[in-house]
Amino acid sequence: MLPAQEFANAITILFPAFTTALLAFETKNTMVTIILIGTLMHTPVSFTYHLLAGLGRHADRIDNDLRRLDQTMQHVAIVLFTFATSGSVFYTTLCCKFNAYYIFRLWHPKTTNDGRRFIPINIAAHFYMLPLLWRADYRNFLIAFESFWFGGFFFTPCINRDYFGGWGHCVFHLALSIHGYALVASIMDAS
């Protein structure tokens, strides 16, 4: 990946944070604020990871501790998002157990980047989208689901590399703004 692409990744990860912050301040809803907290826990780590990758500071751009911390914070944000969309302590506890297991695996000395570390994150992201279905909020579920997978399509390593020249990660970050908006809209509709 080119330095310019990593710098663009660092900038575009700020968009979901700005979107969520504006919505949290506008709605003054506790659950939306929890979404913001999860987003703000992940954003500085992701921004730093991409910035340092752009500066060539990682011996291995993919398999390094800052990348593991970035993925760890994604798992943490997912747990917070799950509580925000479900309001269920029981369901959030189940999600927390799943994510804690995969956080442990991320940091285990024998874990390497075999190209599959993103799979548990993708699975876990559906935990916080399912409550939208449970309350029959089909419109916001479809927007959240489709924006997640639309961005994810561009971020898929072989597609990103072969068809988008490495710029697909930026598209994923931008799609997360739409994704976050749909989550907030669902929370507000349920309030």
Predicted regions and their residues:
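Multi-pass alpha-helical transmembrane bundles in non-GPCR membrane proteins
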Residues: 1-191
